[in-house]
Swiss-Prot record:
This is GTPase Der. GTPase that plays an essential role in the late steps of ribosome biogenesis. It comes from Bacillus cytotoxicus (strain DSM 22905 / CIP 110041 / 391-98 / NVH 391-98). Keywords: GTP-binding, Nucleotide-binding, Repeat, Ribosome biogenesis. InterPro entries: G_ENGA, GTP-bd, GTPase_Der, KH_dom-like, KH_dom-like_a/b, P-loop_NTPase, Small_GTP-bd. GTP 1 binds at residues 10-17, 57-61, 119-122. PANTHER family: GTPASE DER. GO terms for molecular function: GTP binding; ribosome binding. Belongs to the TRAFAC class TrmE-Era-EngA-EngB-Septin-like GTPase superfamily. EngA (Der) GTPase family. Residues 352-436 form the KH-like domain. GO terms for biological process: ribosome biogenesis. GTP 2 binds at residues 182-189, 229-233, 294-297. Residues 4-167, 176-351 form the EngA-type G domain. It comes from the Bacteria.
Length: 436
């Protein structure tokens, strides 16, 4: 299930980023007193009383030179579209302003749960001055102080009350769920159409739990699949063209519901920095990953071109060294038939479970081949290992001192596990833990 999404909405300079940073527990947004400061990072993961959620700071939208009220409206519209719950942020020192009323009108029409927060209530005496905010029409205002961290617990308690109830996915464990992520115009939707066109066994378009997304189930050679649409495939007008960062959030929500992530690149244009960022989201998710080079038909090539492009991918995406690469053309459908077998392979690897005795044989053989490292006269000692999870395969290695597990030796162990058990397209996680 995807995490609920909380959006912080409000006119500039009411303290959205300060509250955002308080909730996620680290300073991610740039906080300044200048209204309309833009930020590079406008979403993050939050947690409150075992409720995990994603949170958006709408102050991260850079609209440009648009009129002031248009900016507010566009912020609110994006938040309305993406969020399950909206925190409507106001400023207790300023009282209710015309801009607050403009935001309120938009949010009132949204039919989304809205929790009204009055920020900059820095002392108890100021609480008596928040009653004017009832006039905005969202019930009880929650007085908070982003600077001092006051009142956030009560605010988040109320926010969590409005999270959607957790629903079970309607697909069984044998169904492979995958999504396509990539920058605009790399051919994601064309590739979906090419895949569906090969078999044309579209069971139905089932509305997914991700807002706006449509899950497309289909079957090929007896294997059931579901394409989790990122909802970024469809253009949504001017607001979305100017808020590209929100396509990242939609992609992340699709990734959360997927077993396999296809990172789609443009073979004609080559690799750019944005591709690397997008690929990083796939890697960080712990999902199985396939790198797809689309538009290969448009590339002038000889017998060395594919190898050179693959080497370029490996150089840029060193963190995805485990991901297989598929070259194809969605437009001509050339080589598209090679994709599903690779998806099957990485999905199977993602779910491999290794017997403990066999696992420990491999670990001890690896140690014999390459002795454990030392640090300040102390040598890492590995006692035994066990697998604790799949999707991705996760192993706990019990040692004398976890601090002695150098990242390079951890990488060596991962490579030995990969070679020994045929892990393809899936990250492997190793957790060093002290033996009791």
């Amino acid at each position: 299930m995807p995490k609920p999404v909380v959006a912080i909405v409000g006119r500039p300079n009411v303290g959205k980023s300060t509250i955002f940073n308080r909730i996620v527990g680290e300073r991610i947004s740039i906080v300044e007193d200048i209204p309309g400061v833009t930020r590079d990072r406008i979403y993050s993961a939050g947690e409150w009383l075992n409720h995990e959620f994603n949170i958006i700071d709408t102050g991260g939208i850079d609209i440009g030179d648009e009129p002031f009220l248009t900016q507010i409206r566009q912020q609110a519209e994006v938040a309305i579209d993406e969020a399950d719950v909206i925190i409507f942020m106001t400023n207790g020192r300023d009282g209710v302003t015309a801009a607050d009323e403009e935001v309120a009108k938009i949010l009132y029409r949204s039919n989304k749960p809205v929790v009204l927060a009055v920020n900059k209530v820095d002392n108890p005496e100021m609480r008596n001055e928040i009653y004017d905010f009832y006039a905005l029409g969202f019930g009880e205002p929650f007085p908070i102080s982003g600077t001092h961290g006051l009142g956030l617990g009560d605010l988040l308690d109320e926010v969590a009350q409005h999270f959607p109830k957790v629903e079970e996915e309607e697909y069984d464990d044998e169904t492979i769920r995958f999504c396509l992520i990539g920058r605009p115009n790399v051919g994601k939707s064309s590739l979906v159409n090419a895949l569906l066109g090969q078999e044309r066994v579209i069971v139905s378009n089932v509305a997914g739990t991700t807002r706006d997304a449509v899950d497309t189930p289909y079957t090929k050679d007896g294997q059931d699949y579901v394409i989790i649409d990122t909802a970024g495939m469809r253009k949504k007008g001017k607001v979305y063209e100017s808020t590209e960062k929100y396509s990242v959030l939609r992609a992340l929500r699709a990734i959360e519901r997927s077993d396999v992530v296809l990172v789609v690149l443009d073979g004609e244009e080559g690799i750019i920095e944005q591709d690397k960022k997008i690929a990083g989201y796939a890697h960080d998710s712990g999902r199985a990953v396939v790198i797809v080079v689309n538009k290969w038909d448009a590339v002038k090539k000889d017998e060395k071109t594919m190898k050179a492009f693959e080497d370029n991918i490996r150089a840029h995406f060193q963190f995805l060294d485990y991901a297989p690469i598929v070259f194809l053309s969605a437009k001509t459908k050339k080589r598209t038939q090679t994709l599903l077998p690779v998806i099957n392979q990485v999905s199977e690897s993602h779910n491999i479970r290794v017997q403990t005795n066999v696992l420990n044989d491999v670990i001890m053989d690896a140690v014999a081949m390459n002795p454990t490292p030392t640090h300040n006269g102390s040598r890492l000692k590995i006692f035994y290992a066990t697998q604790v999870a799949v999707k991705p395969p996760t192993f706990v290695v019990f040692v004398n001192d976890p601090e002695l597990m150098h990242f390079s030796y951890e990488r060596f162990l991962k490579n030995r596990l990969r070679e020994s058990f045929g892990f393809v397209g899936t990250p492997i996680r190793i957790i060093a833990r002290a033996r009791d």
